[in-house]
């Protein structure tokens, strides 16, 4: 995978870069694994905005991804590497001997024609899935489960990986992409390797309209709003916020306020907090 830099034909192409899509081998997705997808645009079931700056964007079809890899002891062949508009990682299409097809996250280095398997005693090979207790120390993994059988939830974004540091008792120690070190049950499963499309975060958007294509709306400062819209709003000209500390549009403390519950049960499993 590489990055292609555009020439300065217009202000929108100046310093703009895009993926060259060289690793993509097919243009149309597997029809049986593709569904229409209604995006909530930041609203909850009552239509109230719970996540601001979401809405619009290009229409997308959802690709059903197999995060659980629950078809065990059956090898699968990699048919193609495809683009997925719903994530920044690429996806790989697998075909099992019985004809079933499934999508998985494309691990870095996995090529068409290779075979992957999900098994307790699977070999340490890129794309294979097995329990953490059977993975050697120092191995890079992705798509890691939080709870046994829950399906992969950790390290699913492009270029991410989790490093296995230690094993002790019923837990293994992992270093997450955020540099947080925490304990996970040794019975959780993970996939060997790093998620592909490593250069995804080096791509320069280049213009505001490209962000709108992704369904991200502009972020407006509260100090330039009216008092009815934000606690920071109002005043003549560039007025200060008029408070001892910044707050959210709903009056809750913002910018540095910790949001994790101090008595959360899983806090005892975190050995070192993440780095911001």
Curated annotation (Swiss-Prot):
One GO term (biological process): mitochondrial translation
Record region (Disordered): 221-276
SMART domains: Ribosomal_L2, Ribosomal_L2_C
A single GO molecular function term of this UniProt record: structural constituent of ribosome
UniProt biased composition (Basic residues): 258-276
Lineage top rank: taxon: Eukaryota
Alphabetized UniProt keyword annotations: Chloroplast, Plastid, Ribonucleoprotein, Ribosomal protein
InterPro entries assigned: NA-bd_OB-fold, Rib_uL2_dom2, Ribosomal_uL2, Ribosomal_uL2_bac/org-type, Ribosomal_uL2_C, Ribosomal_uL2_CS, Ribosomal_uL2_dom3, Ribosomal_uL2_RNA-bd_dom
Cellular localisation: Plastid, Chloroplast
A Pfam family of this chain: Ribosomal_L2
GO cellular component, one term: chloroplast
The family this protein is said to belong to: Belongs to the universal ribosomal protein uL2 family.
Oligomeric form and interacting partners: Part of the 50S ribosomal subunit.
Protein name according to UniProt: Large ribosomal subunit protein uL2c
Gene: rpl2
